[in-house]
Amino acid sequence: MEIAQFKSIKQNFVRELKAANAGKKTSLPFIVHKLSSAPIVEDGEDFEALVIGGSIFKRAICKKTIDKISIIKKERELPLTFKTEKEFLEFIDGELSKDVNILSLNFAYPIKPVFENGKLDGILLAVTKEGGFDGLVGKKVGKEIEGYIFRKRKKKISVSIANDTICLLLSGLTRYRWSELAAGIVGTGLNLAIFLDKEGLVNLESASFDKFPQSKEGKIIDQQSVKPGRALFEKETAGAYLYKHFSL
């Protein structure tokens, strides 16, 4: 691909970004989040953080103090995939510590943010990265986890969930001002996030960007994928598909 073509793709992306910010429908979902006005974790309280990536899992027990969050215990990292909602909920139940009441979920899939009872939940909008989650699309992920844990353990927990790119963007606030930050993840999938202002963030769901010429290999990969016609930019750039370009 020539440099001029890369520049053209960049210009198209910027146009899509500006149009989405103006409220127009574009290939970028442009999912806006607002920061919660109050934390759900008390000072001195332990909570559990789970990272559900496109192909990996991470777990940590953390403690919140007045001025920082400390990792008390960081555990294994392993590959994972979920075909159904049941598999996902059973996995969460198996990994959730019995000693915590709050679960923070870093979730690598497109979710629509929903504030409920003072905490951030998310409705799973679709499945990317050739994932499954059958039965979970269209549901509030945090609420489903809370209900499942209560049925299994007779214990009430609070779950807060955000897209992984939003989590990455927020982590930058520990070192930089919001106006200096943007976040990008190029792993199993592809996504970007930006700040609109001090309290507003946007998950672009960049995988859906389609204002570019597909490669010959990309067209074949798309046709053979679980969701043809969707996440076209991701299918040209991300780890779940990139190796296939060299096999065709």
Predicted features along the sequence, with ranges:
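N-terminal charged helix/coil linker that caps or initiates catalytic domains
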Residues: 1-48
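Low-complexity, highly charged intrinsically disordered N-terminal segments
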Residues: 1-10, 104-106, 119, 127
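Gly/Thr-rich phosphate-binding beta-strand-loop-beta motif of the actin/hexokinase/Hsp70
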Residues: 33-72, 113-114, 178-198
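Active-site core segments that coordinate phosphate-bearing ligands/cofactors
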Residues: 37-39, 169-171, 175-184, 190-248
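Short amphipathic alpha-helices and their capping/turn segments at secondary-structure boundaries
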Residues: 46, 85-101
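Short glycine-rich phosphate-binding loop at a beta-alpha junction
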Residues: 47-50, 99-108, 159-160
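Residue-level signal for inorganic ion chemistry
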Residues: 59, 105, 246
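Glycine-rich phosphate-binding loop and adjoining helix at the ATP-binding site
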Residues: 72-90, 111-176, 180-182, 200-208, ...
